[in-house]
Amino acid sequence: MTALHTPNVDQPIPLDQALPHRKTLREWLIPLSERSTSRAFVLLAFDYALFFALITATVMLEAVWAKLLCGMVAGFVIGRLFVIGHDACHQSLTPHRELNKVLGRIAFLPSLTPYSLWDTGHNVVHHGYTNLKGVDFVWTPLTAAEFEALSPLQKLLERAYRSGWAPGLYYMIEIWWKREFFPNKTHMPTRRPIFFKDSLLVIVFGVLWIAAIAAAAVYTGQSVWLSLLMGVLIPFFFWNTMIGFVVYVHHTHVKVSWHDNKAAWTKAAPFVSTTVHLTFPFHIGGMMHHIMEHTAHHVDMSIPLYRLKQAQAKLEEMLPGRIIV
């Protein structure tokens, strides 16, 4: 029997050949999809230890500059914890589904992110319809006519959001406040009891966080307002700026494609063409738990964060010239 002549998908795919099916791309990454429960616990415990140590330092240190520095680094660590929760929400943190839900909720607490609401907005909408205008709501581009139809305040905000200087403001207002923190029916038509419970959970954590900082300030004879600024507001705003920047650069690059036609969007292989791999010096990508190796994540969401670097390298080896770096 004569073998069928099919493209060799075990070798790099030239640009003049069709992109293989997503199933094939995922098969390349199967060796990198193994998840470790013990590693998940170590990552979560380590980052929480960093978070609590830095928040404590914002109260215990005397110099304002030192408080500010610790507050900003605490915000960065909130981002690291969020990436762990992000993995849990994708079921890529451990092999255990229910454990992932618990660990994800724990990891999301410092970012005040309700787990189930984020799961719906991110897993169902963003990953299900990445860069499909009218469905995916993250950094959706506007036509000139759509921009002109905005109110003066909305125009001002859009200019600020897209200036490159205020991605944190965008995330805080458009994503966290409108869609993740007791969203109204306009932004979240689906209503589930778990949405309310998860929102209440992060409120309780936030209240306890504020109360602990205020009590520590009183106990040490410091300004309560300064302590809250350095120990709560600065970390939270830094975190929003960090995640806002991450999403901004992932989905607004000039080479990233957006579509308003579902058929064209499907044909464009959106899991490859709608995001970028942003590289940094000094191992900053590793310090961010490799969330910037984003193409690999969109191709296969089951890849754990500690294997994304290898997965991204494999895709770039097999798909030369197709991945935006």
Q: Model-found features: residue ranges?
A:
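Alpha-helical bilayer-embedded segments of polytopic membrane proteins, i.e.
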Residues: 34-81, 111-113, 158-173, 191-246
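Juxtamembrane/interface segments at transmembrane-helix termini
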Residues: 245-257
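Short, charged cytosolic
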Residues: 2-25, 164-180
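Short, motif-level signal for alpha-helix interfacial/capping segments enriched in acidic residues
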Residues: 24-26, 59-72, 129, 228-231, ...
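Polar-ligand-bearing catalytic/cofactor-coordination segments
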Residues: 2-5, 9-13, 28-30, 254-258, ...
